[in-house]
C-alpha cells in the first residue's frame, strides 16, 4: 500500500491510501476511491472515524483517503467545504497516475463529517457551484437536522452564532 499526505488550503490535509496491484488479480489496477470525512462536531476531527474506517474500505478493495478539515474558529466561512472540494479535485487530478476510477469517488461521512459530505454533494454556495462533487455518498448519523432538533453545537461551530434562527 502506498501512503500519500497532501496539504490543503487553510491547514487541512488529505491522507491517501492506495492499494498495490496484486499477483492474484493483475488486471485489477484501477479502483474506486472512498474519501472518509470524520465527524467531531466541527470542534475536532474524530480519529476513530478516520483511518480505521479508511483501512476497512482498503481491505475490501478500495483506494481510500481521509480528510482532515478545518475545525473550531477555523471552520468559518465554508473553509471545510472548500477543503473537501479541493480534496475531491486532487483525487480526480491524480486519478490516472494513482489508478483511481475518476467517476467512482464516494464520500463516507460521519456526524458533522456526514453534514460536510452531504453539503459537498449538493452545495449551492456562491462561487462554489462549479466545484468537484462526489459520485456517491455513504452517510453515518449525519448532522442534517436544524431547528428544534438540531445538534446545536455543530451548527454554532460552523456558523459562529448562538442564534437559533441562523440554524434553521
Q: What residue ranges belong to the model's regions?
A:
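N-terminal cap/lid segment of alpha/beta-hydrolase-fold proteins
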Residues: 1-29, 81, 152-153, 158, ...
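Surface-exposed, flexible loop/turn segments at secondary-structure boundaries
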Residues: 22, 42, 72, 113, ...
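Short beta-strand element of the alpha/beta-hydrolase
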Residues: 30-39
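A fold-wide structural signal in alpha/beta-hydrolase
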Residues: 33, 58-68, 106, 136
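Short beta-to-alpha linker loops that shape the active-site pocket of alpha/beta-hydrolase fold enzymes
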Residues: 40, 63, 68-72, 143
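Catalytic nucleophile-loop/oxyanion-hole region of alpha/beta-hydrolase
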Residues: 45-47, 67-102
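Primarily recognizes the serine-hydrolase "nucleophile elbow" in alpha/beta-hydrolase
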Residues: 86-155
